[in-house]
């Protein structure tokens, strides 16, 4: 299971209402953080609107995972869910002045481009 916190991309800070880790049995959660504050998208009327919340971050995370799975499929790479999550964690962006993993950002901010850069190194 992938668990994402959500953050404000303009301020580069975790949202006050975003969940924090760790779990009761000390597993590291969240795995990473995804954008979730004032994210622009299109509504049912075709208008651009800004939305915020954990559901926005979940949509971005799901979309990133779908793109990642499509790429893996096209390249004949078979990974299980745990391996995919670990590669996303490996590609997460990290601030230099912060220790990771931590209770707010997990292993960092979701960065699909950086995940692909890490895969190229293998």
What are these regions (language model features)?
Residues 1-2, 28, 83:
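Loop/turn elements at helix/coil->beta-strand transitions in domains of secreted/extracellular proteins
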Residues 6-59:
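Catalytic-core environment of secreted peptidases
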Residues 30, 110-111:
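Substrate-binding/active-site groove segments that recognize
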Residues 32, 64, 106:
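Divalent metal-coordination and catalytic microenvironments
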Residues 36-100:
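Hydrolase catalytic cores
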Residues 103:
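Zinc-dependent metallohydrolase catalytic domains
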Residues 112-122:
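Secreted peptidase-domain scaffold signal
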């Amino acid at each position: 299971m992938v668990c994402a916190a959500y953050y404000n991309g303009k301020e580069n800070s975790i949202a006050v209402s975003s969940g924090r880790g760790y779990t009761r049995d000390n597993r590291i959660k969240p795995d990473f953080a995804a954008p979730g504050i004032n994210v622009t998208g299109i509504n049912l009327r075709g208008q651009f609107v800004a939305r915020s919340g954990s559901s926005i971050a979940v949509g971005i995370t799901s979309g990133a995972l779908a793109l990642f799975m499509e790429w893996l499929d096209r390249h004949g790479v078979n990974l299980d869910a745990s391996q995919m999550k670990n590669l996303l964690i490996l590609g997460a962006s990290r601030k230099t002045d912060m220790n990771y993993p931590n209770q707010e950002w997990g292993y960092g901010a979701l960065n699909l481009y950086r995940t692909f850069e890490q895969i190229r190194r293998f």
